[in-house]
Regions:
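Lectin-like carbohydrate-binding module/patch detector with strong preference for beta-trefoil
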Residues: 5-164, 168-169
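Short, Lys/Arg-enriched N-terminal segments with co-localized hydrophobic residues
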Residues: 1-3
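Composition-driven recognition of long, low-complexity, acid-poor segments enriched in small hydrophobic
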Residues: 159-201
């Protein structure tokens, strides 16, 4: 006869780099970048899970059980606003940097849920006492509240697409590329000008 293996809980599961996950609150709402905003400083909030890329996260290992948590759509990291460490510090996204404000520890519990702790502040990812769509995330001291427990699930379905979101992202990428071209061209132009100047005798 065959013995069925018990379903693995996240507490027993390794977060694999290159895979993507949803981070769900106790009421099933997931953590997302608000309004698929690709800008630095965009808020991180709760929302109904609609299987969009901006509701999915990668865990990038930074050593010793510490991770950077990267949004699948924007490519930016979950970060503490202004590197704050006090209760109520807002959590937002920021481009990846060697910053301690972007380091998080995933602490498993016996029931398969996790606590997500800022490695810098020693405080937990927390939606406050609110649960509705649009609730902005913060950090708060560990009070073992139900709102401080999260469920991490691997994304196995192909994410839904949004023409509007994809257009916004493509436009931003084009603008960034154009800026990089200008930056690269400027030193070359300055060098050419210097070379063209007659030597002063």
């Amino acid at each position: 006869y065959c013995i069925m293996a018990p379903r693995k809980k996240i507490a027993q599961t390794v977060l694999t780099e290159g895979k993507f996950y949803t981070i769900s609150a106790a009421n099933g709402k997931v953590v997302e970048v608000a309004d698929y905003n690709i800008d630095n400083g965009a808020k991180i909030q709760l929302m109904d899970n609609a299987n969009f890329e901006w509701q999915q996260w990668g865990f990038v290992a930074a050593g010793d059980g510490v991770y950077r948590i990267q949004n699948r759509f924007t490519g930016k990291m979950m970060d503490l606003d202004m590197g704050g460490v006090s209760d109520g510090t807002r959590v937002h996204q920021w481009e990846g940097a060697q910053a301690s404000s972007q380091l998080w520890v995933v602490e498993p519990t016996n029931d398969g849920r996790v606590k997500i702790k800022s490695n810098l502040a020693g405080k937990l990812l927390d939606p406050g006492m609110a649960t509705e769509n649009g609730t902005v995330l913060q950090i708060w001291a560990d009070v073992n509240g139900d709102n401080q427990f999260w469920t991490i699930d691997e994304v196995t379905r192909k994410p839904k697409t949004s023409v509007k979101a994809t257009t916004v992202k493509a436009k931003a990428a084009a603008e960034k590329a154009a800026t990089e071209v200008v930056k690269a061209a400027k030193p070359a132009a300055e060098k050419a000008v210097k070379a063209a100047k007659p030597a002063v005798e």
